[in-house]
Design a protein with these regions (language model features):
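Amphipathic alpha-helical scaffolding segments comprising HEAT/armadillo-like alpha-solenoid repeats
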Residues: 1-9, 30-43, 66-81
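Short inter-helical turns and helix N-cap capping residues of alpha-solenoid HEAT/ARM repeat scaffolds
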Residues: 13-14, 46-48, 83-85
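Mid-chain, well-packed structural core segment of small domains
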Residues: 49-75
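Eukaryotic acidic, Ser/Thr-rich intrinsically disordered low-complexity regions
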Residues: 74, 78-102
């Protein structure tokens, strides 16, 4: 899906749409800064599916663009790990992507 479509479905607020939009952003978005900011915005979600998608999408952004604001990403991931210890595996995978590709 393109940028405008992703924005539209994120605005819907429907869980499955938000999840699909975030993953699409991670895999397709050409604007790295916007993609990173959007993923990080959804780190505030209390919905585990949305949060997992935002974390995974951030890893995709790092892998695809080979660049990321690491300090902000690391701090945000640590905060999420504190709130949702059950997501430690997903967070570890994303940290691996950030370390390997940026």
């Amino acid at each position: 899906m393109n940028h405008d479509e992703a924005v539209r479905i994120l605005k819907s607020g429907v869980e499955r749409n938000v999840v699909a939009g975030l993953i699409s952003i991670g895999l397709n978005e050409s604007d790295r800064i916007w993609a990173q900011q959007t993923c990080l915005k959804y780190f505030a979600s209390s919905n585990e599916s949305v949060l997992t998608s935002a974390i995974t999408a951030l890893g995709h952004v790092a892998r695809r663009h080979c660049e990321l604001d690491k300090d902000i990403a690391f701090a945000a991931l640590e905060e999420v790990k504190t709130r949702f210890p059950s997501l430690e595996g997903v967070i570890a995978d994303t940290l691996d992507d950030i370390e390997a590709f940026t």
